[in-house]
Amino acid sequence: MPLLLSGQKFRTDLESFGCLAILSPLEGGAETRLLRRLRASGYQTQITSARGLGDPVVFLTQLHGIRPPHLGHQNVGRNGALGEVQQVIPQLNELLVEDKPLVLWLLEGQVLSKSELLAISNLCQKEPRIKIVIEMGGARSIKWQPLNEFINKD
């Protein structure tokens, strides 16, 4: 089954809507073709999983604290019962330094709640250099629609 996809319609939809929900074949391959075509047209791309994001907007754009995994017996008196908090640099800060637009491709987007999807959609509207593609499941052929339409459909 050849996939004759130039990526032009996908790119224009991504530029006009900013945030897309995509259904791609489970065997893979279609999304990497689209990513390659986006890179060729001047976009930076980053792929990450939606699992474990927590608050996606804070995780992607703001300085935030995390607690490292518990590795056995540790001194409770030093850091309290919860452990120390480490500050983590936002994922998108370093990538937004350049003038090139950025496409963030989120895998396993079906685990995100409706409010998290709305927050991601609002992030695309606030920061026009960020374009986000969220994989929302599988389909026999690759399909996409604006994230707002996908959210309101449910």
Curated annotation (Swiss-Prot):
Membrane topology: Peripheral membrane protein
Transport keyword on record: yes
Family: Belongs to the complex I NdhN subunit family.
Pfam families: NdhN
Enzyme class: translocase
Keyword annotations from UniProtKB, A to Z: Membrane, NAD, NADP, Plastoquinone, Quinone, Thylakoid, Translocase, Transport
Main location: membrane
Naturally occurring in which organism (per UniProt): Prochlorococcus marinus (strain NATL1A)
Subunit structure: NDH-1 can be composed of about 15 different subunits; different subcomplexes with different compositions have been identified which probably have different functions.
Lineage: Bacteria, Bacillati, Cyanobacteriota, Cyanophyceae, Synechococcales
Family annotation (InterPro entries): NAD(P)H-quinone_OxRdtase_su_N
Gene giving rise to this polypeptide: ndhN
A GO cellular-component term linked to this record: plasma membrane-derived thylakoid membrane
Catalysed conversion reaction: a plastoquinone + NADH + (n+1) H(+)(in) = a plastoquinol + NAD(+) + n H(+)(out); a plastoquinone + NADPH + (n+1) H(+)(in) = a plastoquinol + NADP(+) + n H(+)(out)
Protein name: NAD(P)H-quinone oxidoreductase subunit N
Gene Ontology molecular function terms on file: oxidoreductase activity, acting on NAD(P)H, quinone or similar compound as acceptor; quinone binding
Chain's role: NDH-1 shuttles electrons from an unknown electron donor, via FMN and iron-sulfur (Fe-S) centers, to quinones in the respiratory and/or the photosynthetic chain. The immediate electron acceptor for the enzyme in this species is believed to be plastoquinone. Couples the redox reaction to proton translocation, and thus conserves the redox energy in a proton gradient. Cyanobacterial NDH-1 also plays a role in inorganic carbon-concentration.
Subcellular location: Cellular thylakoid membrane
Keyword Transport (UniProt): yes
EC number from the UniProt entry: 7.1.1.-
